[in-house]
Amino acid sequence: MSDMRRLMILFLLVGLAVVLSGCATLSVHSKVNKDGSVESYKLVINTSSFVYGLLAEGAKKEGYESLRESFLSEIPEEMRDKVSYDEVWSGDQVSIIIEARDYVPADDDKVKIRKENGFLIYEDLSFASENNQTSSNELGNALLSSFSLHYYLEMPGKIVESNANVVKDNKAEWHLTGASAFNTRIYAKSEVPGIPGFEAALAIVGLLAAGLLFGRVKG
């Protein structure tokens, strides 16, 4: 299992713990580079101080001083310089912010990026159940009814195909609630921008080559 996949599983476990403990909103902000690497993948969990207290209490029972320490202890050592953890408080509400930066998804990661026929294809299967069906369990649906997922994706080029709720230029948004948030495959297909100035450089090289060829013929 790749380090990034382990980290993604950890992200989801934290999010799931919050969901099962009470109402919550989960936001994902993902930004992709034109070479297919991920510039940043940020997870923001917004919940109440009560739910946070339950999670912190669970962490202390496991021998950790805080929820932060509990989370950071699970991150592979080679990934620690690429991952940050922050908490932002506002009255009775808290935002848990976890971000990974500058990594290339492995083949077994939930986040998959590939180049195909001149396009860049992005998929995130983190929120797609294996059978892709909404649970019929009444208790499960009740627990998830207060859950919201907001996913924001920024691709390096214009998005030409996606299952997002909103698409504008190189950005896409998904806004999901309840059990449907865990039955969704995040998908987008974008153009791959050229290297700035590359076309101009080719034109200059072409003109120089033509000039040399013309000079030789004339000579």
Swiss-Prot record:
Q: Which Pfam families match?
A: PGF-CTERM (PF18204)
Q: Which domain of life is it from?
A: Archaea
Keywords, sorted A to Z: Cell membrane, Membrane, Transmembrane, Transmembrane helix
Instruction: Report how it sits in the membrane.
Output: Multi-pass membrane protein
Does Membrane show up as a keyword for this record? yes
Q: Which residues form a coiled coil?
A: none
Write out the annotated subcellular location.
Answer: Cell membrane
| Residues passing through the membrane, by range | 8-28, 194-214
Please provide one cellular component term from the Gene Ontology annotations of this protein: plasma membrane
| The keyword Cell membrane appears for this protein | yes
Q: By what name is this protein known?
A: Uncharacterized protein AF_1487
Give the organism, scientific name.
Answer: Archaeoglobus fulgidus (strain ATCC 49558 / DSM 4304 / JCM 9628 / NBRC 100126 / VC-16)
Ranked from the top, the taxonomy reads: Archaea, Methanobacteriati, Methanobacteriota, Archaeoglobi, Archaeoglobales
